[in-house]
C-alpha cells in the first residue's frame, strides 16, 4: 500500500503482540501509519482535496483528518488545521509534526470567526463539528445510556455558526463538507437546512 492507503488489521486495537506491536508502534511514531476509524475517513474522501488546494480543517484536533488531507495534497498546497481548544492544539501539532508533511499549518482560532486566509477563500473546507457523538456506539457502547435530546439542541447553534462561516470563507466553486459523529438530525440535517 502506498500513501493514502487504508487497511484494517486482522485484530482489535490493542491486541497486537510482540514484533507486530513494535512494528506498528514504529510506523505510527514515524508518521507512516495513522490509526483512524474507517468511517472517520469518509469526510475527507468526500472533500476531494487535490494537489495544490488550500484547505481548512476547521475543527481539526487530534489531526487524523488533517494528515489524511495532507496525503491528498502531496507536497503542493496547504491544509490549515484549526483548533479552538488551546489544550488540544499541542496534540494537533504533535500529530502534524509526526506526519512530516510540509503542507500542514496549525492555528488556534474560534472557527466561527476564522479569518479569510487567503483573501480569495479556501478551495475546500472541512467542518467536522463538535457533536454529541451519538453515532459512536460501536466503539463507545455507553453513549446511548447517557444520551439526552437536549444534547443536540445545545450544540445546534454552534454547529450552524461554524457551517455558516465555512460558507463565507470558501471560494466560489469550492467544496464544503460538514460532518459529525452524531445520528441526531438536529445536529446534521437541521444544521445544513438552516444554513
What feature does the model see in each segment?
Residues 1-195:
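S-adenosylmethionine
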Amino acid at each position: 500500500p502506498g500513501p493514502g492507503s487504508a487497511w484494517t488489521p486482522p485484530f482489535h486495537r490493542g491486541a497486537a503482540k510482540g514484533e507486530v506491536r513494535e512494528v506498528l508502534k514504529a510506523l505510527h511514531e514515524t508518521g507512516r501509519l495513522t490509526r483512524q476509524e474507517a468511517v472517520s475517513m469518509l469526510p475527507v474522501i468526500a472533500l476531494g482535496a487535490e494537489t495544490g488546494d488550500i484547505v481548512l480543517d476547521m475543527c481539526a484536533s487530534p489531526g487524523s483528518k488533517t494528515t489524511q488531507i495532507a496525503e491528498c495534497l502531496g507536497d503542493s498546497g496547504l491544509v490549515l488545521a484549526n483548533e479552538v481548544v488551546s489544550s488540544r492544539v499541542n496534540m494537533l501539532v504533535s500529530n502534524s509534526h509526526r506526519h512530516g508533511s510540509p503542507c500542514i499549518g496549525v492555528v488556534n482560532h474560534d472557527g466561527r470567526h476564522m479569518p479569510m486566509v487567503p483573501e480569495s477563500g479556501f478551495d475546500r473546507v472541512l467542518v467536522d463539528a463538535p457533536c454529541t457523538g451519538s453515532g459512536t456506539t460501536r466503539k463507545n457502547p455507553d453513549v446511548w445510556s447517557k444520551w439526552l435530546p437536549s444534547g443536540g439542541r445545545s450544540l445546534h447553534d454552534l454547529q450552524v455558526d461554524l457551517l455558516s462561516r465555512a460558507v463565507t470563507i470558501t471560494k466560489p466553486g469550492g467544496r464544503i463538507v460538514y460532518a459529525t459523529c452524531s445520528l441526531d438530525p438536529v445536529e446534521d440535517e437541521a444544521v445544513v437546512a438552516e444554513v
